[in-house]
């Protein structure tokens, strides 16, 4: 069976043996409240994202991926705009507009996947996963919007979830929409235009 699966998918046979030995913990999952797909399908998408980590862990034997590069000195009492500014400074982005959130997240060690969710109402979601004591965030993009602007916003929204998780701020007390806006276009830049 392994051989047939390996040949059909074009994966090395070692992957199937190696993937079974990976002990992964899903620390948290964030699905946007506006997501309208049924809960049972949301569970399936979470599992697909878990499989993405298994594939990544296998590929790390051949490819060096960027390490997680997220600020660790968040203060949960800072306002949302200050938290967004802190991430921008940490990543040395200045105050300009961010054109490509996908590349920005990936070079900072956040894995972004397009799970090919061809369902209306499917939105991006995130997971924090740990394998062998190493944590990594994964973002899965919803596939019902093809606009680069919307995709950038969705990724900034998921970054807000990551920041809230790292700062240990409850979701109810943290506006991910406000963070996404402040991160993508800081107030200083907006008022200059």
Task: Pin down the residues of each PLM region.
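Short juxta-domain linker segments that transition from a proline/glycine-rich
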Residues: 1-193
